């Protein structure tokens, strides 16, 4: 039952129950927040998986790029929300705030993602709600129509209590992964918008300029459509962070 619900979430299609072919063709990306090691150490750990030397670009996010065998760029960046610790659990500098950002992935890349997670954990990476860390899954929005986007929101809203229980979402993280806004849901089902633009107007309560604000307050939803309107992919923010390869695969 859980797997069927997940399939419907990812494809936004009510007819996918029991059919996982759609999931296997869905493109996605993942952001994993962690600490216990520096960004440089995390980048080097990922580089060892690919036999690749990280490039340090710096900037406000202190970005590192690591190329894989398909010339895709994996990134390690700074995230200010993380509670930073060193490998001994003591308070640490901002160098220990680590966010791993994957390139666009496919189903066949999941074992590779698991290998990356194992490498970071072996390099002293730690994570979890106690460090204010989460995992964000970005799902390609290209297949979505206004109807399937409405379906996504309604399925999510109807099952989110179950999902929060199943995923054991920490109360410490609920500020950053709020449940579906009930006013938005009510207007969505009352007006039944026929276009993506009309749904966007409801999401931003008429303030269409909000789509250009990266840190829009609307982004802190477990089912984040700000990411869809701004970048073309919706975001699932309800997953507690983990560096356990099996947990990553289950997400």
Question: Which residues are covered by each model-predicted region?
Answer:
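Positively charged N-terminal leader segments that act as targeting/secretion signals
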Residues: 1-10
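C-terminal accessory/tail domains of diverse enzymes
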Residues: 11-129, 142-251
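Short, conserved phosphate-binding/catalytic loop or strand-edge motifs used
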Residues: 131-135
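Histidine-centered divalent metal-coordination motifs
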Residues: 136-140
